[in-house]
């Protein structure tokens, strides 16, 4: 087993950890934090279960699933290894969840993140929801213990962003940092791993989630006026230009350009999502916005020249599913094909979902409301982690 694990960790270090996020930087926590914790887990696993052991198995599982996908799902040995380490990671995570109040470091929070990474790489459906719910519950517990802000901030930002983007309700006390006007939370779009996701975007998306929760209610004239104001704010909140880098700092400059294109892709996807899901606009009415968003996705790849990792997939899902004509749909097919080099199964499942939405709209007499990606992604076969 050690020789097989060594191969998996080698792949994690050289490929998976670098591709699981859009931009691989020197401070990538997938290496700087997870690897030391995984080492502790490897050394201590004979003594019993702990969060570090869960991290070790999660890294091995992610790497094995990644290798299996990169082999076009032909290497059965990698699949068997992936399932073994996946089961071990979940076993140790659950065991330590029962002792969550005993944890005094970041290892359990990182174990949750490592297991969510497994779900993304493997494309396993539905189970990711348990990890996100558990992460929010653990965050609530940590915050109630009055821990120092420095111990909470990174995990809170990570979990709250993830939950909002995945449509989870988040308690007000956990997302209060989004309304912080002191400037401490500015520039979120430049931080790992949610490149391109600004504080204002998260606030707006959280509000859209609440609109969708209340969608069955008949709005009053005052509520319609508030909705009009909110819609106008969405349109006006165009992403600003990234900070100017020194002319010689080529990599930094490239990363800033990539982040700007990513922010703009989120901007257009957010408008499309609002129009289609809250305003119930027809597909034809959002095609200008969709095309602009697809251009941003293409620009990210052009700037990255094949060296980037995986973009957060929410704008891809929204923009891809709302492509209304064959030309735009073909551009999205090409985009998805280019991402297969990453070996992440959730991309494959979302590509299939998008194509299913397109086909559903071509059926004679099809209701556009029924052929919405939100209806399809609720089905077990498509409910993958979409970030």
Residue ranges and their predicted role:
Residues 1-58, 62, 69-78, 243-247, ...:
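Acidic, Ser/Thr/Pro-rich intrinsically disordered transcriptional activation regions
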Residues 52, 104, 152, 258-260, ...:
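Short coil/turn linker motifs that delimit alpha-helical repeat modules in TPR/alpha-solenoid proteins
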Residues 36-46, 58-75, 84-125, 135-141, ...:
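Hydrophobic/aromatic-rich effector regions of fungal transcription factors
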Residues 106-107, 156, 348-351:
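Residue-level recognition of the N-termini of beta-strands and the immediately preceding loop/turn
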Residues 105, 198, 344:
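Residue-level signal for threonine
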Residues 306-310:
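Extended C-terminal subregions enriched in glycine
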Residues 132-136, 179-180, 313-316, 354-362, ...:
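Short alpha-helical linear motifs
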